[in-house]
């Protein structure tokens, strides 16, 4: 996949505001400090398409980004942010749940769940992953911040993530770095696989 252009399409807080173009969608979820916005910017080769907040937990809406005029990357609110009220957490959960329910049948092709490769998945990560699988959604795990560990530790950390999340052999975990683009081509290849956009040829 070659990403030629990307732009912010719309910010939504309820289904009536979602895009109506019919484009397929790939959604991103992750803890509020995992670098979700930075990963999206790296994938589309833009420095500030998705806004990187100075305070974790900044994303409180759903942001749709048009990629190549063919599909959307969807930035969902971060979870696991401690310094917010229970009411706010419930509001964000409802925002995510409403999106998943309304888009999973016709638009949502994959959910990308982001974790920090340096640490074992948290209780919130485990709950989120089980929740996504309960929806029957195709889920890809991206283990970000691989630039913060040695090459020799990558395999060890990936195995730990697989064990904690109880992944089967068919479920993929891709080590990634938003800083140096490590793993970029593998992630884009996964996007090719699920999108099957006419005229696109999968590249190694």
Swiss-Prot record:
Cofactor names: Mg(2+)
Binding site for Mg(2+): 37, 59
Gene Ontology BP term (one): division septum assembly
A molecular function (GO) term: GTP binding
Residue ranges annotated for the EngB-type G domain, each copy included: 22-197
Primary role: Necessary for normal cell division and for the maintenance of normal septation.
Family: Belongs to the TRAFAC class TrmE-Era-EngA-EngB-Septin-like GTPase superfamily. EngB GTPase family.
Name the UniProt record assigns to this protein: Probable GTP-binding protein EngB
Species whose genome carries this gene: Ruminiclostridium cellulolyticum (strain ATCC 35319 / DSM 5812 / JCM 6584 / H10)
